[in-house]
Design a protein with these regions (language model features):
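Charged, low-complexity, helix/coiled-coil-prone segments
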Residues: 1-5, 40-52, 84-100
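Charged phosphate-binding loop/patch that engages nucleotide di/tri-phosphates or the phosphate backbone
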Residues: 5, 147-162
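Generic structural signal for well-ordered, non-transmembrane alpha-helical segments
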Residues: 18-21, 25, 45-56, 97-100, ...
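Secondary-structure edge/capping motif, primarily at the C-terminal ends of alpha-helices
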Residues: 27-38, 61, 65, 156-160
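Long amphipathic alpha-helical segments
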Residues: 64-68, 99-103, 158-162
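Long, charged low-complexity segments
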Residues: 69-150
Length: 162
């Protein structure tokens, strides 16, 4: 009979990071391979959904870690409460807050009014209407999002391994 081994703090943090990094690898494939060859808005939507899952996984683990470190009294049950708790935890990190703002849009991406522009063309654009604004999500915007998420993952890793 095998005995279960307890995972050390560092090992658990690495497991969560592996899960987050796997999501990022899948998202990068959508951005740099699938979108390059198909140039459809469906790929953009799937990419945003993939990023949403990655940010969700990260924020859940960040909140669990913060609770263990007694930086927050409890983990909120609802998604809006979790977002608010994360905003308070990382209020000094501007990039982190930008990613959380992006996440709020990504959460609603499937229900938002969207317009597809230039599908199957070089300048494919998904026009999203969010909070009364018109947001054009094209390849340049996606690369900006990808850079922000890269920094977000780095911050997440530092926090989880602290």
């Amino acid at each position: 009979m095998r005995r279960k081994r307890k995972l050390t703090k560092r090992k658990r943090g690495k497991d969560f990071m592996e899960e987050i990094i796997q999501e990022k690898i899948s998202a990068d494939h959508l951005l740099y391979v699938s979108l390059k060859y198909t140039k459809t808005c469906d790929v953009i939507i799937n990419l945003l959904i993939r990023w949403k899952k990655m940010i969700e996984t990260s924020t859940n683990e960040l909140l669990k870690h913060a609770k263990k470190k007694k930086k927050i009294p409890s983990i909120p049950d609802n998604p809006v409460g979790k977002i608010d708790a994360i905003k308070i935890l990382f209020k000094k990190d501007a990039n982190f807050l930008e990613v959380i703002e992006m996440y709020e849009m990504f959460r609603k991406i499937e229900e938002l009014k969207k317009e597809r522009i230039g599908e199957f063309r070089k300048n494919v654009t998904l026009k999203v209407f969010y909070r009364g604004e018109e947001i054009n999500i094209n390849l340049e915007k996606l690369k900006i999002y990808a850079d922000r998420l890269e920094k977000f993952i780095s911050t997440t890793k530092q926090f989880l391994l602290s």
